[in-house]
Amino acid sequence: MGLEHVLLACIAGATVIGMSKRQPFPEVSQRFGIVLLLIGLIGILAQNAPEPPSDRFWQSAFTFVGGLGVVVGMRHLAYTRMDVLIAPFSGILLCVGSIGLLWDEWGVLTEFEQIAAFILAAFLCTGEVYLVFRGLLIGRLPQAWSQAGLRNLQRGLIDGPNGALSCFEKAWDVEKEHLNPMAYLALQRITAAKGHADEANKWAERLIEQGGE
């Protein structure tokens, strides 16, 4: 069973790194993905040892890493608003690790403890569904895209998939309309400086619709 845990860590790490390219600050989730890949690679080496790690070791490791990742991910999801990937992927590890530990102890638990363990497992799964829904399905980071646009503008990265133009084009939000004029103004100034009159006029009209400068 240890090999399955190793594969899960590697797949999760590679997926996070791949999806991080579509985040305003890709380095945040990339670091987490690299940590998962390192855990997986170390696990591959450990599985070939004379005494490979037990399932309980992997379950405990996933519970610890997943729990810590959920805390860090929720901070980014709700406070810094810089990343939406760490929390849901950490939740997967937390569910796999903690539910695995409960399953191994199921036979020696009393009836009351089994009920409590079942409620805990259901709570963890419900929390993971929320993290996936909140982070991967509806997670939007308009403020972070604006910040990333300003950072890339200072670095001189204007064009391209991760350039300032692309970032500001994503920095709008229906619920937080106060962010939209800043994005429109930045887009109007950048396109005007590049000599794209039609694009500049389009963003200028959007800016006027929001009340102007």
Model-derived features with residue positions:
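Long, contiguous interaction/recruitment modules in multidomain scaffold/adaptor proteins
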Residues: M1-A144
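Alpha-helical solenoid scaffolds that mediate protein-protein interactions
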Residues: G73-L77, A171, H178, L207
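Helix-turn-helix repeat elements of alpha-solenoid scaffolds
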Residues: L120-L124, L153-S166
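Residue at a conserved register position within TPR or TPR-like alpha-solenoid repeats
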Residues: W145, N152-R155, T191
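Structural register within alpha-helical repeat arrays
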Residues: A148, L185-L187
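TPR/TPR-like (Sel1-like) alpha-helical repeat modules
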Residues: W172, Q188-E213
